[in-house]
Amino acid sequence: MTEMEASHRRWNMIAGAAVFVTAFSCYLTTIGSTLAFWDCGEFIATAYILGVPHPPGTPLYQLVAHLFTMLPFQEKAFSVNLMSTITGALTALFIYLITVKILVQWRGTPKGPRDRMIMYSSAACAALAAAFSSSHWSDAIEAEVYAPSAFIMTFITWLMVRWGERYREPGSRNSLVLICFLIAISVGLHLGTALVFPAFIVFALVVDWRIFTDARLVVLAVFAIILGLSNHLYLPIRSSLNPRIDEADPQRWAAFKDCILRKQYKPMTIFVRQAPWSFQFSMFWRYFSEQWTGAGGSWTILLMLAGAFGAVIHYLKHRRTFILIAGLFLMLTLFLIVYMNFTDHEVRDRDYFYAHGFIFFCPWIGVAFAYLADLTASTKWSRWLTPVALAVMIAFTFSSYFVNFRTHDRRGDYNAHDYGYNMLATVAPNGLIFTNGDNDTFPLWFIQEVKNFRKDVRVVNLSLLNTPWYIWQLKHIEPKLDISFTDKEVNELRPFRDRDGKIVMVKDIAAKDIIDRNQGNRPIYFAVTVADYMGYDPHLVLEGLAFRYEPKEASESIDLTRTLYNLYSVYKYRGLLLPAAGGPASAPQFTDVRKWGGADSTDFASRYVYDTKVYKDTNTQRLVTNYAAAHLKLCVYYLQNAEFDNAMRELERAILVSPGFEGYKEIAVATYGYAGQIAKAESLAYSFLAAEPRNVNIYLQLFRVYRRANNQQGAEGILMRLINALPDNPDGFSMLASFYEEQGAHAKAADIVRRWLDLHPNDKSAANLLQSLEKKVRGE
């Protein structure tokens, strides 16, 4: 090794370490303290108990994450999050190393300080662009499979590039065996990791096609692949022990195969598009364009143009490695657009599917920056111009850190944790609760398995209830449910169409049987997030975040005592509410839950504030509206019983816990109006109408407020405003005509109906009404 090469190796290691420390520090200062919504709760819970998560099971992730749960941290969720943080930072490190190798193959080993400065700074910019990209940053601070998968992908790619440099050296083919093993074993992290394989094959063909004629190498590669895939034996081994979370029950060959192939999900097809091509590509472009500047940013195009320019330079300077990087980028972006075939109504943003592709775009940013820096080095002002240019490039890269920091800071975010805790705490001892999907199921599993809280409650996920293995587990694994079907009958359950033509799903059959067999023995609940209550609505009574099922039709739709107790004395709101300055350290406790008297009740909203320090994405905001909805339900109850002070308290609490919730507007107008605060009701209504001039319910609610206050002029005025704003809406005309009739102003009523008929001459019922009114005007 020459002195120049030794110097390069030493400084390259120092720069790489700096990149790793920078990325790791970024992630460590924004890492989630506990679980996040979506799959995180499930992955942490199954890693902790060595269970089986949703197909395809991610066995390698479970094993490695379980080791992280053994770290001496009290919060096990943080320990598993740390796995993503470390692998996310390692991903940035290997993007740096890959970019350096590309630059060395093009520019040669750096010959002096300025050459090293250009190379290492440009490669660091590429790595930090990857580290600060929105999707990868999100993956690196929560318990998900994508950061470990990205690390393995970049490590494999670095090995490929390294082999491409040394393929003529003795023993270099051993790297290919290692690559095959890593690709195979990493499928146990995420199936998408296998997408590096086509790029690997093409790159190997371009570099040295003769390796495919080496029988010994082929045999070793096949053996390495089989050995790597063997980590999937975890699934049947652990499943046979019946852990409390055992999705797909893959202990038998048929179930194991179905788990790997994800048979329980809707089959994918690339030929029947689930959304127009234009939508799917525009969705991808939106995700791509928001990576470094956030939604609505204007700088992204510059960074993306730099990457596109770098791709051209890379192609011109070193086509071998260009083929590898371009192949990876295309497989992880364009291929996925075609293969994943996303709908135009996905339940969440799917940017994380393309995160690896965005990462492999970043080396081209480094190539572009190095090329531009070289241009400055060839000028007579290079002594100062090159450092300035590199400083600008580094600052530009770091700008994405500051732009994305707010939306990626998970410190203090306990919303998912407390949501799961609160929902479980709602359920009476030994109860069961029907849930709907990921976000009302996985946090509950986490709280039960990791926190060891309320394991007496049986969580029944309605989506999984369509599968026979899940029904079997509900029947045979503690806490067991009484189910009338035999195991054979469970396997034979199929959807059918009833007499009315409605499709009855397996979950409908199973849920009805569970309710029929367990009512009276177990308290039964439905989470408020359940979309279809299967006709049991009249039997459901709200108790906070869940409805309790009553065998007979309920006389009240809300249990006032239990709901108040849960909302104010049981539920936790960390990351959502904070005590105001000088306020209490914890939520007040009830003494008389029906008439919550004393100082605690009158100024609650002023003693607690919305926690603006904790960022809440749209999904979190949507889920916490369930707290607001419960308070609004209480508000309506109090309005109906003329308890206006209590109604205002609940309204203010609803607005406090979910400021962006749209559902409170009409109720707010009613609450203040019925409480006699007409001016405030008017002010609110007109502010709402300024933003939503076509919101009919606001007009009508303010009309009712005026009528209740005997303000006939105000009532007439708001209805006139409604018919002027919405001349095609019949409600305003109908109510105004009725209002005039009640006042005995039949002529005015007739004029309103004529005005409607001028716009809608074919309305026969309006024509008949006009005839009746005209008779009254004539005194007939």
What do the PLM-derived regions correspond to, one by one?
Residues E742-E780:
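Terminal, low-structured helical/coil segments at or just beyond the last alpha-helical repeat
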Residues S79, H631, Y664-K665, Y699, ...:
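Canonical tetratricopeptide repeat
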